[in-house]
Amino acid sequence: MRKEVKLGDICNILNGYAFKSKEYVEDGIRIIRITNVQRGNIEDNDPKYYDISKIEELKNYMLKENDLLISLTGNVGRVGLLPKKLLPAGLNQRVGCLRIKDERTVSIEYLYQYFNSYNFERDCINNSKGIAQKNLSTEWLKNYKVSIPNLNEQNRIVNELIKIQRLKKLKEQQLKELNQLIKSQFVEVFGDIHLNDKKWNRNKWRDVLIIKNGKNQKKVESFNGKYPIYGSGGIIGFANDYICNENAVIIGRKGSINKPILVKTKFWNVDTAFGLEPIKEKIKSDYLYYFCYFYNFEKHNKAVTIPSLTKRDLLNIEISVPPITLQNKFSEIVKQIDKQKFEIEKSLKETQELYESLMEKYFG
């Protein structure tokens, strides 16, 4: 049996304090800002602090373990539970804090799962004010209606979702470890590419690969296109024509210049991305990709604001060229690890789909 209640009837909703940046110190009260509230968790990137001696003065804005925090500006509707390790912490302006009034009837973990749903975030976005930047009011939150079952049912739902989330994190960690294994195998087989400690022959890029400029995709873009369209950050659409052949590497011409992508199929690259086609008898695509992964392209950056590379500079990069037999050996290692990754990715996708279906079932 569920009942609909206004959030303000079951929660105290707190607004944050306008901490002054000129009063930041090296350590003390951690300030929880909009940037710390990400989808599903509270991140601790670039921490800012206030003097610990002001803790009594700021007592109305001091946070507690498991406070449910919500972003009220920008990416509105993102929520996370505050972990104990981030205390003592103060609530900054435009971050909301939700505290349960009666824990005998409502679980904060249940509300966290509820508000971590797509439907809640969509409602927040649709009910925000502002054009350039979205702003969500705590008054709207107070009147937001939530569907609450009895406490036992809340706990059952939470436990079910937590199990799936843990399984998802486990699979993500397995993928991370397999990716790290490939990188460590690259170093073990080929050594340090910067030092060339294994004394491989050295060539210029112009001798071992072809750089293909990207082009505007408008004339070839098609919803039913056969070939993926890549920017420097990944797939952005599909096309009925291609520029680069299979087993080529993408690096950014502008923007994301230090994030190479290995593409196994033919593809169209846009004008902000270079396609690198290895000359097969000299260099393998797996080797080229990991060379690019470990290489710092920032040294060739010609721009002040948006990072930018030129084809001329890239063609003059020196690359160690191990024997092709050794490159083939590394490719075989990658192939075997990729098989494991494929199975985990497949299982991860199924786990994610199960999680999304349950979120829709309970909170849709």
Question: Each predicted region: which residue ranges?
Answer:
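Short, solvent-exposed loop/turn positions at domain surfaces
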Residues: 18-19, 57, 169, 303, ...
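Non-catalytic DNA-recognition/assembly elements of restriction-modification systems
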Residues: 1-16, 143-159, 174-216, 220-231, ...
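Short coil/turn segments at secondary-structure boundaries
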Residues: 20-27, 46, 126-128, 198-201, ...
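A short glycine-rich beta-alpha junction/loop motif
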Residues: 4, 88-96, 106-109, 129-152, ...
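Sequence-specific dsDNA recognition surfaces
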Residues: 6-21, 35-65, 206-246, 263-264, ...
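A short beta-sheet element
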Residues: 33, 53-116, 231-298, 302-314
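Periplasmic-binding protein-like
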Residues: 120-123
